Amino acid sequence: MSDLRITLDPDFIAQTKKEVTPHWGELGWVTYKRTYARWLDDKNRSENWDETVKRVIEGNINLDPRLKNNPSKKTIHELTAEAKQLFRLVYGLAATPSGRNLWISGTDYQKRNGDSLNNCWFISIRPQKYGNSHIVPAYLTQDQVAPSMPFSFLFDQLMKGGGVGFSVVDENINQIPKLDQKVDLTIVIDKQSKSYDASLKLGATDLDEWKKTNQEKEDYIYYKLPDTREGWVLANARLIDMHFNSTNPENKKKLVLDISDIRPYGAKIHGFGGTASGPMPLIEMLFDINQILNERAGQKLTAVDATDICNLIGKTVVAGNVRRSAELALGSSNNQDFITMKQDKKKLYHHRWASNNSVAINSEFDNYQPIADSILHNGEPGVVNLELSRNYGRIKDGYQAGIDGEVEGTNPCGEISLANGEPCNLFEVFPFIAQKQGWDLKEAFKLAARYTKRVTFSPYDWEVSRKIINKNRRIGVSMSGIQDWILSTFGHRVVTGFKTATDSETGKEIKDPVYDPEIIKTVDGLYQAVVDADKDYSQELNCNTSIKHTTVKPSGTVAKLAGVSEGMHFHYSGYLIQRIRFQETDPLLPALKDCGYRTEPDIYTPHTICVEFPIKAANADSDNFASAGTVSIAEQFATQAFLQTYWSDNAVSCTITFQNDESDQIAPLLHQYRYAIKSTSLLPYYGGSLKQAPKEPISKEKYEKADNHITGNVEIVFEQTNEDQKGLELVDQSDCDNGACPIK
């Protein structure tokens, strides 16, 4: 029997559209239309919101493994009812799956690529076996350990649109053997290739010229790259592995890579979307990586070398147009070369921008001042406490030795602690909106837990991932718009004050936060609802319960859809101008102008138009409202600790902002919360002083004046013109303050 497929009835969708109004933020519909609405060739337009939600929910509900094995009528009925509930929840924007799911779920690409629904991944940079994976170099057996494997994993996941955290701590880097030899790399290309001239300028060699003097020789390895993602990965793997005797069985020192078949710049990429970069970025990457490896011949790679290789891979992937490479490098806290590697401005601008860098610590670590000094200068490194992640769920639940003992790092935004090869798996509920729309919050979080659980049954491409996902079934149910919800529901922020206390280990005076007990009780109840939902569904599916369940994701672009505060973060300002950049040919622009939005040419990027959106935060007029520009660094630390203690058993993504006069508090606060925060990062608060800044705080009066100029609904005006175009995106989006997340 073929798999049964659940679909949502058009009559149900039509009725829901009458009953439920999506909670679009001021930027919501425009952001959706240019980020997550897929092009429909048969209708010559991009999706509408109900079509996107239908695709996403159907793509998810049909992952339930029971549908593959003659499901009962009861199961079909229950899953159909659940799909309807999910549709209502997401259509109303009371909750959303991750941006990755909004873009990919329910597509043919999802069916072809088992990894496609997971936003981000983690891999340890040490020799590993490829195993029974979709990519295995022909010169290796599946069980052969190879230095190239983690780099191949990273390259593959980045090209599939995922972000990757990677670990270059001493314990991993020390496992890489010394490089045995240099490799003479030649990249050849046929004259018939449209990329011929551009490739020669970057150091490639004419194929016919090379054949004249080399074809009869036998001292080289030749590999012709197919025009596939896997071909790029395998070329890089061969280059890396040839430097090591254990993975160079022919013991040859010359590598010839033929790029003639790679599609040219501008050609369409089927599947994920976008247009091709041509082979030029790959040529640069391969030569750059080979230079790093050759310079280490006879020695061992350093953490900086490995990070450089990963950054060069990330830089190459960025050139693929629709993708934005997201990396987090995790190094040892005593490695000063790693901590200071971005101070080399030449290499920073060339490729080291491609990762956010953090250091791995434990709770005994106390040398925070050098970290604080570095943060003050360039906003890095972030801090990841692996000891807490391995031995704690929620801090409230106490020490549980090895409860997550295989954790080695995090995803790029730091909200999910991950084992080697493991992905994050995210869904977020906006309690502020869910309550307004009449949802029982526990029911909303239950639906979120079941959605993420189904994602773990995807047919994953890499053996290392399949094994750890099958074991851990990790999910990440997030709440977002937290500041809006707490202030609207409880009338004040979660931190009601501070009391003087003494650090039991150092004897120093500290200020302990005081939390509202009603908020503690509410959040704890929602956590239990997620755990109970996972337990019940795991029994239905006969699989392991999830090792961890909850998180707080940064929620940049997705929060814009619903118009709520991002994750746990405070609004940037009570009132602000948010500037969004559009390609100058975007047919949305006339609709925006007709509705009264201010537009002007972008001063930084040619052929780009900057549009100003006046934004008012929820509760902006409340006496208890605080923004990122007014809330203290101490309250932000305390708020993150609250969520780690009572809500998140994974971690909490937070970029704490600080004013110049608060910089001396960074090291003491990192030390104070060493037993309560699993990962964090900090950035100075800039306040939008740049011309055409993405966010510019403004007064209430200026907001009201700008808002009064807006006279129409962009969605309605745009649909009346019916002039949509394929392949348009917003220019230079950022999904969170530190730019760590892929947008979709």
From Swiss-Prot:
Region Effector region-1, as annotated, extends over 148-159
| Disulphide bridges | C120-C424
Keyword Kinase found: no
Q: Which reaction does it catalyse?
A: a 2'-deoxyribonucleoside 5'-triphosphate + [thioredoxin]-disulfide + H2O = a ribonucleoside 5'-triphosphate + [thioredoxin]-dithiol
In this record, what's one Pfam family? RNR_Alpha
> Region labeled Adenosylcobalamin-binding-2 — which residues?
690-729
List the residue ranges of the region (Adenosylcobalamin-binding-1): 570-631
Any Gene Ontology biological process: DNA replication
Q: Which Gene3D superfamilies match?
A: 3.20.70.20, b-12 dependent (class ii) ribonucleotide reductase, Chain A, Domain 2 (3.30.1620.10), b-12 dependent (class ii) ribonucleotide reductase, chain A, domain 3 (3.90.1390.10)
MF annotations from Gene Ontology: cobalamin binding; nucleotide binding; ribonucleoside-diphosphate reductase activity, thioredoxin disulfide as acceptor; ribonucleoside-triphosphate reductase (thioredoxin) activity
Subunit comment:
Monomer.
What's the protein name? Answer: Adenosylcobalamin-dependent ribonucleoside-triphosphate reductase
Quote the gene name from the UniProt entry: rtpR
